[in-house]
């Protein structure tokens, strides 16, 4: 048996991070061997009187570079490492166990190895045990991979070998959201995603997973199904792109104002991307919350209003008004057109509705005759509560596009339920959201 130094170990521990190579530029080639192609090219250029100065340098493109260290990784990507334990002695080593832990600023996670193997094991001379560990990093900051090997010497003494490998987990994306509360039940979400890495990547999927209380309609494709983006979501470093979604409350929630006030969580953004060499990453935002719903006194819904109508045709649309206050209302409805050459339509209305208790609704039709081509805005509609002497003015009731009588178009398209609120405020906010791993 050979003598082993006291500080030496009977086994060698090797750890290598598994990752795709990177593209690096080598810059111009200024020296080369005489037999190299570059040297021959340089000689021919020097003998050519028409060649310019510095033609002896040949710029090299990017080449693949294997990882030289643990480096860094981006949040949402999968950390993979190859761990190998080798018996460097001519004698067997008994009771060999290998353990790997990943330590962050807030947690310490055990990464299982050799799940189907018996532990501990006996390493014969020159023998090796190895395994690949994988973990999807879920926290930004400094991480330390702790690898520990325990074994017994031929004399029966327990020995331990431990190594530490430090790497950084960086933020790959910056996500900002803007909510637009329209004067209807619809909410529009604009999500801006910025690439904060040092290399380009491709956004493979950006979806808004709606909550159980809201339905989501993406607005990022053209009517023919093509994406609005000319390049398939390719983002260069520090560049950003925007995605738009329409969010609507479901079923009974949209009908009940009090219920609508309670449900503000609309869903989460699910983002999947790939690096320039195909490395996959996935992140999900925290729960996105819409702006607080405000409806002070009443709301008006426009039902079954056509988008397009021919000039000279009566434009009729139905309305529903709901008393959202805590006291009863006796409403007078008045729609008046200005009698002037510049008036866009003719027609008026002035009538009373039945008494509306709190939460009750009433429907009524309104009719006008457009007198101008183009987009005609029906406004204003004045609702007066005669019991409290309150007056509510709806500035923009509905829009209709008026065309010539020979215009050939399908006029069966109707606007879906448009819900307008009294005293609708500015409904825009911008918010930076928190990313998390799913």
From Swiss-Prot:
Homology family: Belongs to the TRAPPC13 family.
Native organism taxonomy: Eukaryota, Metazoa, Ecdysozoa, Arthropoda, Hexapoda
Gene Ontology biological process: Golgi vesicle transport
Pfam families linked: TRAPPC13_C, TRAPPC13_M, TRAPPC13_N
Name of the protein in its database record: Probable trafficking protein particle complex subunit 13 homolog
PANTHER family from the UniProt entry: TRAFFICKING PROTEIN PARTICLE COMPLEX SUBUNIT 13
GO cellular component: Golgi apparatus; TRAPPIII protein complex
């Amino acid at each position: 048996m050979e003598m082993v130094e006291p500080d030496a170990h009977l086994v060698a521990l090797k750890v290598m991070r598994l990752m795709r190579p990177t593209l690096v530029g080598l810059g111009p080639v200024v020296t080369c061997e005489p037999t190299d192609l570059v040297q021959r090219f340089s000689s021919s250029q020097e003998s050519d009187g028409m060649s310019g100065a510095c033609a002896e340098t040949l710029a090299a493109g990017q080449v693949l570079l294997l990882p030289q260290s643990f480096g860094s990784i981006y949040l949402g990507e999968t950390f993979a490492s190859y761990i190998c334990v080798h018996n460097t002695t001519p004698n067997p080593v008994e009771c060999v166990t290998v353990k790997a832990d990943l330590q962050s600023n807030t947690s310490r996670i055990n990464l299982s190895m050799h799940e189907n193997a018996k532990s501990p094991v006996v390493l014969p001379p020159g023998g090796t045990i190895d395994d690949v560990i994988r973990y999807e990093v879920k926290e930004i900051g400094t991480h330390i991979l702790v690898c520990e090997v325990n074994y017994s010497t031929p004399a029966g003494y327990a020995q331990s070998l431990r190594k530490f490998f430090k790497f950084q987990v960086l933020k790959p994306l910056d996500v900002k959201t803007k909510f637009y509360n329209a004067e209807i039940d619809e909410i529009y979400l604009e999500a801006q995603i910025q690439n904060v890495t040092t290399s380009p990547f491709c956004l493979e999927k950006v979806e808004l997973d709606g909550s159980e209380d809201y339905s989501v309609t993406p607005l990022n494709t053209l009517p023919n199904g093509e994406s609005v983006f000319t390049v398939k979501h390719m983002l260069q470093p520090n560049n950003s792109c925007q995605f738009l979604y329409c969010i609507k409350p479901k079923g009974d929630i949209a009908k009940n104002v009090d219920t609508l006030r309670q449900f503000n969580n609309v869903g989460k953004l699910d983002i999947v991307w790939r690096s320039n060499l195909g490395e996959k990453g996935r992140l999900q935002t925290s729960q996105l919350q819409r702006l607080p719903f405000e409806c002070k006194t009443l709301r008006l819904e426009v039902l079954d209003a056509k988008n397009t109508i021919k000039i000279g045709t009566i434009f009729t649309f139905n309305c529903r008004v709901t008393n959202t206050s805590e006291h009863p209302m006796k409403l007078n409805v008045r729609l008046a057109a200005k009698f002037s050459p510049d008036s866009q339509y003719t027609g008026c209305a002035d009538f009373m509705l039945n008494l509306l208790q709190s939460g009750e609704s009433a429907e009524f039709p309104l009719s006008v005759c457009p007198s101008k081509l183009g987009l005609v805005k029906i406004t204003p509609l004045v609702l007066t509560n005669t019991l409290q002497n309150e007056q509510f003015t709806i500035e923009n009731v509905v829009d209709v596009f008026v065309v010539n009588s020979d215009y050939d178009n399908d006029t069966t398209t109707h606007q879906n339920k448009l819900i307008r609120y009294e005293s609708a405020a500015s409904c825009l906010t911008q918010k930076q959201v928190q990313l998390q791993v799913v």
